[in-house]
C-alpha cells in the first residue's frame, strides 16, 4: 500500500501545471477589401460614385476622383456581407471621340478565425478584360449602364457565397468571377503573398 501511494505521489509530482492548460482561442479578425479602378477615359466622360457595404453592414457612398479607389475595413464579426457597385453616370458634355472605357470592381476579405485558420477570398470583374471602345455619347451611356455589382456573404466559418446587394439602381445580372487572377491581383494591391490564392 505504501508503494502504491508513493507511486501515485511521484506521478502527480512529475506532472506539469501546463498539462491542464489549453491554448486560448485566437481573437477573430476580418479585413474587408474594396477596389474600383477605371481607365483614364472613364473620368473624362462620366462621374463615378462608389457604393459599398461597410464593416457594420451600412451602405456607404463616395465620389471617385482618381483612377483607383481603394478601401480596407476591419471588423471582428462574422457573418458579414460585402457589396460594391460603381455607379457610372455619363456627363452631359460628352462629345464624339475615341474612348477606351474600362472598370474593374473587386471585393475581397481575409479572415483570421479564432481556430487559427486563415481564409483569403475575393470576387469581381476580370482585371485582365480589354477596354470597350466608344465613339458617341450614346455608346458611352450604354457602357455606363452596364457597371457590374459585386456581392457576397461570408459565413461564421469564413467561407463566401455570392449574393445580391441592392444599392438602388444597380443590376446584379453580371456574374461575379473568382479565380486565381482576381485573387492574385487583390493580393498584389494589398501586399499579401499571391501563393495564398
Protein language model features and the residues they cover:
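Noncatalytic modules at the cell exterior or secretory-pathway interfaces
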Residues: 27-38, 79-88
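Exposed low-complexity, polar/acidic, P/S/T/G-rich flexible segments that act as propeptides
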Residues: 97-113
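Tryptophan-paired
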Residues: 54-90
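Bacterial Sec-dependent N-terminal signal peptides
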Residues: 7-33, 194
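Short, ordered, surface-exposed loop/turn motifs in non-cytosolic proteins
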Residues: 41-55
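C-terminal partner/receptor-binding element of secreted or periplasmic proteins
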Residues: 120-197
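Extended, low-complexity, turn-rich repeat/linker tracts enriched in Gly/Pro/Ser/Thr and Asp/Glu
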Residues: 39-43, 92-101
Amino acid at each position: 500500500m505504501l508503494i502504491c501511494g508513493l507511486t501515485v505521489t511521484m506521478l502527480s509530482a512529475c506532472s506539469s501545471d501546463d498539462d491542464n492548460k489549453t491554448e486560448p482561442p485566437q481573437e477573430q479578425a476580418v479585413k474587408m477589401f474594396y477596389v474600383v479602378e477605371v481607365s483614364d477615359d472613364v473620368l473624362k466622360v462620366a462621374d463615378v460614385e462608389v457604393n459599398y457595404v461597410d464593416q457594420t453592414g451600412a451602405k456607404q457612398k463616395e465620389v471617385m476622383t482618381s483612377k483607383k479607389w481603394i478601401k480596407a475595413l476591419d471588423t471582428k464579426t462574422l457573418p458579414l456581407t460585402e457589396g460594391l457597385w460603381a455607379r457610372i453616370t455619363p456627363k452631359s458634355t460628352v462629345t464624339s471621340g475615341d474612348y477606351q472605357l474600362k472598370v474593374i470592381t473587386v471585393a475581397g476579405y481575409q479572415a483570421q478565425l479564432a481556430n487559427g485558420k486563415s481564409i483569403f477570398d475575393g470576387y469581381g470583374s476580370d482585371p485582365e478584360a480589354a477596354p470597350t471602345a466608344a465613339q458617341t455619347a450614346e455608346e458611352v451611356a450604354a457602357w455606363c449602364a452596364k457597371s457590374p455589382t459585386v456581392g457576397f456573404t461570408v459565413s461564421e466559418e469564413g467561407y463566401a457565397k455570392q449574393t445580391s446587394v441592392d444599392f438602388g439602381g444597380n443590376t446584379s445580372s453580371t456574374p461575379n468571377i473568382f479565380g486565381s487572377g482576381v485573387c492574385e491581383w487583390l493580393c498584389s494591391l494589398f501586399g499579401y503573398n499571391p501563393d495564398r490564392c
